[in-house]
Every structure is written in structure tokens, then in C-alpha cells.
């Protein structure tokens, strides 16, 4: 659109379709504007620029993958991710300045590119503004223990552990729980989770809300008392700051990307170990003083 201050292009990379056309248009725009720098909000952008490029890079599969995340992939997926990461690293080296969300990711960027740490700026994730306008007073409607488990329905979130967690809690005598998730109803992940819980005769222990607006999500948080973060790979999960804002004591996987954000305000467990996670929840549910200590640490 001529005369506009912004341009909308087809999603890239689209090597078999619009890529060459978009590449040519970007070169024309850069030549006309002659920018002092280019800021790639989602990087790498698959294009080269004459101006210095600042990349906003937030892909943990490239900067800090781990054995637990790799273990959930099929052989085909492992090959795909390996080749994908090689290409991402190649393109990252075209830039000399980066923005990311955590020190964990920043260290990975420096290791890959060889850039000094002062070339990588960490800008942390923040709480959605709408949450600050919503009353976060807890809502207690019954004697159920409600646990929020929020995130996109991606494999590395490790929501597949939920049935085993519920079974382990049941074995420990913690039966009055409900885990609240926000997985799209048509997604195969929730269908698998529900099937596993049905086989265990524990279907009543989970509530799937599907896609929620931020206001609806806030109301869900208000009705929960705890938060579960089973993720195996992150840069900075929004669920961490959301849970802290709503004062939900957290049980999370023990990784640098979690401990960097949550510090001592959380109980950690060995990744993929449902029994260990259940033991931490049992400890948390039984100890009101511990709950208050963790809540207090969230405010620091």
C-alpha cells in the first residue's frame, strides 16, 4: 500500500510461493527508507538487509534445548529440529545485536554467535495489562483443590503428564483435585489426556476450558489455588508471571529457564517425573505456612 507507514506481507518463509517477490519488495523499501537499523521482531527473518539488524530471538530449541525436550520427539522430528536449528544458527550469525527474554536464552545466543554479552539485551516478559485492571481476589466455591495448568497445546509443554500426575496424587490420598487446562477442544492432545484419564477412572479430575480470552483466563486463575508448570522447554512462559500475580503457589520443572524467573517462590521437581510432582503438591497442599511463604517470595 503506497503511502502507508506499514506493509503486510504473506507469511515467510514461503520459498515455493511469494518469497522472491517479498524479498524484492523489502529491498525496494529499504533502499527508499534507508533505515539506520532493522528490528526483526520474530527472528531470524530469512532476509538480509544492508542496514544493521537487531534480532528479537526467542527460540529455545535453538539456544538451550535439553535431553528431556529431545526425548519426547520422534526420530523424524529429531532430524527435522536438528536441521532446522542448524539453519537458524546460520542466519543468526548475520546479526550482531539481539533482544531476548531471559539470561538463559541470552547465554545461548552468545554461545552460538560469538557475540559479547553486551550485544544481547534481556527484556523480560510482562503481565498482560488487562490483568492489572481485574480484581485478583481468590474465589473459593467449594472444597476442591483447583490447579491451573495453562499454555499452548505444544508437545514441549508436556501436558501429557497430567493423567499420571492425577493418578499419583490419587495414590497419595489427594483426591479432591481438579486440574484446569486451556487446550482447544478439537486438539488431539486433550483427546489423548481424556482417554487416559477415562481408562484410569479419573475423568472428573480435569476441566478443559478451551480457548479463553484474557478476562476469562483471569477469572479462571481466581478460582484456582495452585499452578502446575510441567514444561520441558521455554524461553519465558507467560504462565509464570500470571500465576505469581494471582498468588498461586507453583510446582514446576527444575530448569534454569524456570528458576531464573521463579527463584525460591516455587517448588521444583525432576522433569517428566509425575510421582515427584505429586509429592510436591502433597507437601504444598498440606502446609498452609509453606503456601504463604511462597506467596510472600512472589512479591519480592
Annotated model-derived regions:
Residues 232:
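Aromatic "clamp/platform" in nucleotide-sugar-dependent glycosyltransferases that forms part
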Residues 267-274, 283-288:
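Conserved acidic donor-binding segment of nucleotide-sugar-dependent glycosyltransferases
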Residues 4, 191-215:
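Nucleotide-activated donor-binding/catalytic signature segment of Leloir-type glycosyltransferases, i.e.
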Residues 177-194, 210:
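Glycosyltransferase donor-sugar binding loop
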Residues 249-252:
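Short hydrophobic beta-strand element within catalytic cores of glycosyltransferases
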Residues 139-157, 163-166, 180:
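Conserved donor-binding/catalytic core segment of Leloir-type glycosyltransferases
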Residues 77-98:
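Membrane-proximal helix-turn-helix segments that form the acceptor-binding/catalytic region
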Residues 26, 30, 211-212, 219-224:
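Short alpha-helical donor nucleotide-sugar binding micro-motif in glycosyltransferases
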Amino acid at each position: 500500500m503506497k503511502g502507508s507507514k506499514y506493509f503486510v506481507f504473506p507469511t515467510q518463509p514461503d520459498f515455493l510461493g511469494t518469497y522472491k517477490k517479498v524479498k524484492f519488495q523489502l529491498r525496494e523499501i529499504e533502499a527508499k527508507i534507508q533505515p539506520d537499523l532493522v528490528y526483526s521482531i520474530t527472528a531470524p527473518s530469512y532476509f538480509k538487509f544492508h542496514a544493521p539488524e537487531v534480532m528479537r530471538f526467542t527460540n529455545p530449541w535453538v539456544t538451550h534445548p535439553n535431553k528431556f525436550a529431545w526425548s519426547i520427539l520422534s526420530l523424524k522430528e529429531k532430524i527435522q529440529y536438528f536441521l532446522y536449528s542448524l539453519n537458524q544458527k546460520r542466519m543468526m550469525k548475520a546479526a550482531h545485536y539481539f533482544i531476548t527474554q531471559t539470561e538463559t536464552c541470552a547465554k545461548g545466543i552468545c554461545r552460538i554467535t560469538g557475540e559479547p554479552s553486551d550485544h544481547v539485551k534481556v527484556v523480560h516478559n510482562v503481565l498482560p495489562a488487562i490483568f492489572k485492571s481485574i480484581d485478583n481476589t481468590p474465589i473459593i466455591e467449594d472444597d476442591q483443590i483447583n490447579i491451573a495448568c495453562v499454555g499452548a497445546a505444544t508437545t514441549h509443554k508436556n501436558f501429557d503428564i497430567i493423567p499420571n500426575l492425577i493418578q499419583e496424587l490419587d495414590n497419595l490420598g489427594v483426591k479432591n483435585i481438579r486440574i484446569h487446562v486451556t487446550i482447544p477442544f478439537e486438539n488431539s492432545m486433550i483427546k489423548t489426556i481424556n482417554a487416559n484419564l477415562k481408562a484410569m477412572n479419573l475423568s472428573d479430575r480435569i476441566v478443559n476450558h478451551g480457548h479463553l480470552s484474557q478476562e476469562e483466563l483471569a477469572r479462571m486463575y481466581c478460582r484456582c489455588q495452585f499452578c502446575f508448570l510441567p514444561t520441558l522447554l521455554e524461553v519465558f512462559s507467560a504462565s509464570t508471571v500470571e500465576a505469581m500475580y494471582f498468588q498461586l503457589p507453583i510446582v514446576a520443572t527444575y530448569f534454569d529457564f524456570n528458576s531464573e524467573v521463579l527463584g525460591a517462590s516455587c517448588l521444583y521437581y525432576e522433569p517428566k517425573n509425575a510421582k515427584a510432582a505429586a509429592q510436591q503438591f502433597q507437601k504444598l497442599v498440606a502446609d498452609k505456612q509453606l503456601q504463604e511463604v511462597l506467596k510472600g517470595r512472589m512479591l519480592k
